[in-house]
Amino acid sequence: MATPNCLILWVLLIADTVWTQSVRQAYEIQDPEDWDVHDDFYCPRECFCPPSFPTALYCENRGLTEIPPIPSRIWYLYLENNLIESIPEKPFENATQLRWINLNKNKITNYGIEKGALSQLKKLLFLFLEDNELEEVPSPLPRSLEQLQLARNKVSRIPQGTFSNLENLTLLDLQHNKLLDNAFQRDTFKGLKNLMQLNMAKNALRNMPPRLPANTMQLFLDNNSIEGIPENYFNVIPKVAFLRLNHNKLSDAGLPSRGFDVSSILDLQLSYNQLTNFPRINANLQHLHLDHNKIKNVNMSVICPTTLRAEQDAFIHGPQLSYLRLDGNEIKPPIPIDLVACFKLLQAFII
């Protein structure tokens, strides 16, 4: 005799089979020209609607120049790698369930985005607009948005108030754009109360961006022209754990004496800069990249972030550094034995 769990599984399998068959029959019997966007099984003829995944609409790699009408059942919309130049309101007027839109690799401009086209999507969580022709961060955007991907555009402007209502945004990717220091005001990031990852690598910044969101945990600023870090800069982002500043123009003169002595930072990347001395670090730091600078000496009085405790608790309370890169500098052997004595948890040391 079948158990209750087996019966439930059997019923679910039957229901799924019936749904899939009904979808397939709808596609086979109906002429696409007769379909209406309000129909349960409507599928734009330019796209593919998999019967086994009825909430997804695949329209990628089809040479489309316009966005087709989006059925109301769709949660996931794939429109990448087309020739689309605009985002009007009308195709989305019934798409009230959309959670995910991928419009990467198109030709979308700010002028082509109708004002209410995106903000009307009240349930949208993920918006991908990478590799387009945007010159500023689009606005207005839906309050529900959690991730905004704008890499590899031409963004040089962030209009005032763009992020003021995006309190649910956790990830903002602006890498490989044309941002200068004048793109930021003191309140540019106001409203991003839950932002955790901010990527502005490969821009043209010379200074650290001001007033970052307090919950920022991952900050990526590689491949800019940043020359220094203001005193107490990290006080406003007390949760920052991953900091990447590779390929900048940081020098000793541009760093406060305790610029990186920040207890929250676990991974610090300063490769390919112009540092001549080992920066002061915090005992909590786990990964440190200092390769390809101009460091000549290893001064243990600066490097070792705390006075070593008794041998029995050094592993618990001492420096937590486990990975250190110093290759590509001007350091001459021998390396001080105190280096190993200080960093007892060191597992990888590249020099």
From Swiss-Prot:
UniProt keyword list: Disulfide bond, Extracellular matrix, Glycoprotein, Leucine-rich repeat, Proteoglycan, Repeat, Secreted, Signal
Domain (LRRNT): residue spans on this chain: 34-72
Glycosylation sites: 94, 168, 223, 299
Ranges for the LRR repeats: 73-94, 97-118, 123-143, 144-165, 168-181, 194-214, 215-236, 239-259, 264-283, 284-305
A GO CC term assigned to this protein in UniProt: extracellular region
Keyword Nucleotide-binding annotated: no
Superkingdom to which the source organism belongs: Eukaryota
PTM comment: Binds keratan sulfate chains.
UniProt cross-references to InterPro entries, sorted A to Z: Leu-rich_rpt, Leu-rich_rpt_typical-subtyp, LRR_dom_sf, LRRNT, SLRP
Disulfide bonds: 43-49, 47-59, 304-342
Gene Ontology BP annotations: cornea development in camera-type eye
Gene3D superfamilies associated with the record: Ribonuclease Inhibitor (3.80.10.10)
Signal peptide start and end residues: 1-20
Tissue note: Selectively expressed in cornea of adult where it is detected in keratocytes but not in scleral cells. In embryo, first detected in periocular mesenchymal cells migrating toward developing cornea on 13.5 dpc; expression gradually restricted to corneal stromal cells on 14.5 to 18.5 dpc. Detected in scleral cells of 15.5 dpc but not in 18.5 dpc embryos.
SMART domains in alphabetical order: LRR_BAC (SM00364), LRR_TYP (SM00369), LRRNT (SM00013)
Entry's localization field: Secreted, Extracellular space, Extracellular matrix
The protein's role, per its UniProt record: May be important in developing and maintaining corneal transparency and for the structure of the stromal matrix.
Family label: Belongs to the small leucine-rich proteoglycan (SLRP) family. SLRP class II subfamily.
Protein name: Keratocan
Organism: Mus musculus
